[in-house]
């Protein structure tokens, strides 16, 4: 078994892995975890869905990046997000988009069911789209979940505040191994 670290949509992949094979997961570290698509993100998805075949996908990606990471101190994360998007083709973007549009039932299940696996959420205090849902889940999943919120930090915590993120994750894993 191993410790798994996932950022943003990667947290969904780790949680699914833990659902399917809990014996393989020693702990889960979720950075910028997505546990619920809030009202803004739902609107964002609907707008994107309307324009995904009309607008160049890079325009939509830039819009998403700015909405999810709007502040000046999120610029590095925004640029990383956009530069990675440039490596995708329109077809791949549409597949990614369909995946995110269909994720709600899975996220609801994750919020309702607590796994008996230590779970450490590391979130940015400025992650207005996803932090509220994580706070709620941690308050309900008290047996296995804990949360650390990084000040002056947005959604992509491992980029915005890499040093703090790494320090806290290593501390958590060390505690799990003792």
Regions picked out by a protein language model, each given a short descriptive name:
Residues 115, 121-123:
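Short beta-strand/loop motif that positions the catalytic acidic residue
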Residues 1-8:
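Alpha/beta-hydrolase fold nucleophile elbow
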Residues 15, 19-20, 25-55:
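Flexible "cap/lid" loop of the alpha/beta hydrolase fold
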Residues 117, 131-139:
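Short alpha-helix in the alpha/beta-hydrolase fold that links the catalytic acid
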Residues 39-41, 58-113:
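Conserved alpha/beta-hydrolase catalytic His-Asp/Glu region
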Residues 125-130:
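Acidic catalytic loop of the alpha/beta-hydrolase fold
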Residues 144-178:
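Catalytic active-site module of serine/aspartate enzymes centered on a nucleophile-bearing elbow/loop
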């Amino acid at each position: 078994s191993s410790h798994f670290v996932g950022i943003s949509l990667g947290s969904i992949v780790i949680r699914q892995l833990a659902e399917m094979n809990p014996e393989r997961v020693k702990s889960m570290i979720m950075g910028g975890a997505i546990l619920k698509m809030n009202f803004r993100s739902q609107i964002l998805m609907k707008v994107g869905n309307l324009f995904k075949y009309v607008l160049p996908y890079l325009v939509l990606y830039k819009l998403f990046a700015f909405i999810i990471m709007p502040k000046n101190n999120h610029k590095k994360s925004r640029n990383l997000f956009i530069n990675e998007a440039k490596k995708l083709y329109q077809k791949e973007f549409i597949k990614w988009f369909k995946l995110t549009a269909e994720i709600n039932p899975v996220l609801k299940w994750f919020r309702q069911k607590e796994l008996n696996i230590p779970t450490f959420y590391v979130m940015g205090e400025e992650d207005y789209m996803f932090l509220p849902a994580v706070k709620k889940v941690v308050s309900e999943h008290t047996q296995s979940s804990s949360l650390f919120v990084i000040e002056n930090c947005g959604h992509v915590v491992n980029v915005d505040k890499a040093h703090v993120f790494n320090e806290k994750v290593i501390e958590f894993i060390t505690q799990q191994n003792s």
